[in-house]
Regions:
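Small-residue-rich anion-binding loops in enzyme active sites
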Residues: 26-105, 177-206
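Active-site nucleophile and cofactor-binding loops and adjacent substrate-binding regions
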Residues: 105-107, 131-139, 187, 213-221, ...
Length: 321
């Protein structure tokens, strides 16, 4: 049985059922699975299934306890067409994996649609109503809202930095008129939104369960690992991947897949002027700075100066490997 432990050494481990609805660990660390219990993922590239069934197979490979949650669920009901990613040629040696065919045109639909469905099912089991708290630089918020807006067991509060996301993303979030959806514009940066969310998640002041759908939640990683397994399935030789990176959740998912057998050589994180990730990979030191404005507002997801997800890869010095 896979157990989940904190990156900061908290001794108590939790189960898959607990990690579904988890935020931060009691010591404010991020949860990680005991990787020794996870099989090599490369053999899954031989599966010939629909993308949704393929993702279910990967979830079960990552944790067999997920089977009772994914087997009879529609993980991609929000997609108008197949959720299978699309590959387009850029030139003779480079392809683009298109992950913008979901309901919000964000790659985060691919992980949040399954997570929303699984979290709703788990809350129904418990007879509880949960509160999802999300900090967003634009894309997570709209994708999270779409994932849970029809939920019978979830309310969602989204924190976004005022005037620092694209107008398209703002309209996506604020035009959803549902009794369980709440949007709050924060006077500050995404890092400020993330700080507020982490403080609430680590010291819950409310008398109800608070859930994170940010990549703090391990199931987000599982959903993202799934499309890297699918991607390597399309090639006979190892590949390199280049990923626009802000909080490092997506790039970490590629690294996790590689560390569990996927044929990925280089993982290249691309940043803008907020280059804390570049400095981290160059020096091994994670040194947050003040967020600087960029000329690419549509890429607000990389306007981040205090990424928290590198903590998973730094755990135990694993970033060196």
């Amino acid at each position: 049985m896979v157990k989940y432990q904190s990156t900061r050494g908290h001794k108590e481990t939790i189960s898959f059922e607990d990690v579904i609805l988890s935020g931060l660990a009691p010591d404010k660390g991020l949860y990680l699975p005991d990787s020794l219990t996870i099989d090599n993922l490369n053999h899954l590239t031989e599966e010939d299934l629909s993308y949704e069934d393929f993702v279910k197979t990967i979830f079960i490979a990552l944790d067999k306890n997920s089977a009772k949650y994914v087997d009879d669920l529609s993980l991609y009901s929000g997609f108008e067409h197949s959720a299978e990613p699309v590959l387009k040629d850029l030139n003779d040696t480079t392809l683009i994996m298109e992950l913008f065919h979901g309901p919000t045109k964000s790659f985060k639909d691919y992980a949040l649609q399954p997570l929303g469905a699984i979290a709703d099912k788990r809350l129904s089991e418990l007879g509880e109503r949960g509160l999802v708290l999300v900090a967003t630089s634009g894309d997570t918020g709209s994708a999270a809202i779409q994932a849970v807006k029809e939920s019978e067991n979830i309310d969602i509060v989204v924190l976004h930095p005022a005037d620092k996301i694209s107008d398209y993303q703002r309209q996506q979030m604020t035009s959803v008129i549902k009794d369980n959806v709440f949007n709050i514009a924060v006077n500050g940066s995404y890092d400020d939104c993330q700080r507020i969310a982490k403080e609430i998640l680590s010291d819950n002041p409310f008398e109800r369960r608070i859930i994170s759908l940010n990549s703090i939640n391990w199931l987000r990683v599982m959903g993202q690992v799934s499309y890297y397994v699918w991607l390597t399935k399309q090639f006979t030789s190892p590949i390199n991947v280049a990923i626009p990176s802000g909080n490092f959740g997506n790039a970490y998912s590629a690294w996790f897949g590689r560390s569990h057998g996927l044929k990925i050589n280089q993982i290249m994180c691309t940043t803008n002027v907020n280059d804390v990730l570049k400095r981290f990979t160059d020096t091994g030191t994670l040194e947050p700075l003040i967020t600087k404005p960029s000329v690419a507002p549509s890429l607000s997801l990389i306007h981040i100066s205090e990424p928290t997800r590198p903590e998973r890869i730094a755990y135990g010095g694993l970033w060196l490997k």
